[in-house]
């Protein structure tokens, strides 16, 4: 659907790029000619994704082990990227954390764990790149992955909803502040896109999966390639007049029932106990 080499030689960083939607976006960007950098906390995951990408696209993928919750690690990573490849043309803030829980059961540690990645980590990476773009007088594009419940809120994922709402506020604030400097900031608000691992934590049984699907006017979940195509367009020069926008891609779910995880009201206490996060998992 895109012209060949739409992203030719564009240097793009994807946080959380080793798995799931981040990996899907990375593959699409490489198909369109980008030079890709992915970061994450697990070296073995990044190495596996890099090996897969290198086999398909040659050596156009670089990895950085980085916990974006730590501003010192973020600064070191971004400084290394600028030193090694002269900077970036695009940033995709994709790294996230989420789990289902009744809000009254949340500890401060659980709240901080999600906000540290979703809100603070996203801001750390964006600002580390942004101050270099501004200092160098460079144009760039920032794309942040939020959620379809960013505007409405949602029960049982309150920390994620808080963090994503903050990221959307950051996106629109910087779109105005940095727009005159040639730096575009946009967001994508995905609905349900099954990914390995995360999907099982959020949708623990077939009955809940069926109930969720029934809420979506199009009657299905999203496909990772659909989101990757949207991301490729928004990060590309062809979206050069789009700034401060948040594009929802959820099959119309938010129009039918705004609070995404409200169908979890049907869970029993045993279901909640079974889903409680366990150390080491």
List the predicted regions and their residue ranges:
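The beta1-alpha1 cofactor-binding region of Rossmann-like NAD(H)/NADP(H)-dependent oxidoreductases
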Residues: 65-76, 108, 225
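Alpha-helical segment proximal to the catalytic Tyr-Lys
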Residues: 131, 176-180, 240
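Conserved glycine-rich cofactor-binding loop
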Residues: 16-20
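Short C-terminal tail/terminal secondary-structure segment
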Residues: 2-3, 243-281
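Short, small/polar-rich loop/turn modules that mediate ligand/substrate recognition or access, typified
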Residues: 92, 179, 184, 242-244
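Active-site helix of classical SDR
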Residues: 126, 163, 171
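Substrate-binding pocket helix/loop in short-chain dehydrogenase/reductase
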Residues: 102-115, 208, 212
């Amino acid at each position: 659907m895109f012209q060949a080499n739409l992203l030719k030689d564009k240097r793009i960083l994807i946080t959380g790029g080793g798995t799931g939607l981040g990996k899907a976006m990375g593959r699409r960007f490489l198909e369109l000619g980008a030079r890709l950098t992915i970061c994450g906390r697990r070296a073995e995951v990044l190495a596996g994704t890099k090996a897969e990408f290198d086999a398909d696209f040659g050596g156009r993928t670089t990895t950085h082990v980085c916990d974006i919750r730590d501003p010192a690690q973020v600064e070191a990573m971004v400084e290394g990227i600028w030193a090694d490849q002269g900077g970036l043309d695009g940033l995709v803030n994709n790294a996230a954390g989420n789990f289902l829980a009744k809000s009254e059961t949340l500890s401060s540690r659980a709240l901080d764990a999600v906000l540290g990645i979703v809100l603070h980590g996203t801001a750390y990476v964006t600002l580390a790149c942004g101050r270099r773009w501004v200092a160098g007088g460079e144009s760039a594009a920032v794309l942040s992955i939020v959620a379809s419940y960013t505007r409405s809120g949602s029960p049982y994922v309150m920390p994620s909803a808080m963090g994503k709402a903050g990221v959307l506020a950051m996106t629109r604030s910087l779109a105005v502040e940095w727009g005159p400097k040639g730096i575009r900031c946009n967001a994508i608000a995905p609905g349900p896109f099954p990914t390995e691992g995360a999907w099982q934590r959020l949708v623990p049984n077939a009955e809940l999966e069926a109930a969720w699907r029934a809420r979506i006017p199009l009657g299905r979940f999203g496909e990772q390639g659909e989101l990757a195509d949207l991301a490729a367009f928004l990060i590309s020069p062809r979206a050069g007049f789009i700034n401060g926008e948040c594009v929802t891609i959820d099959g119309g779910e938010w129009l039918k029932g705004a609070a995404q995880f409200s169908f979890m009201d049907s869970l029993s206490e045993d279901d909640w106990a079974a889903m409680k996060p366990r150390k080491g998992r």
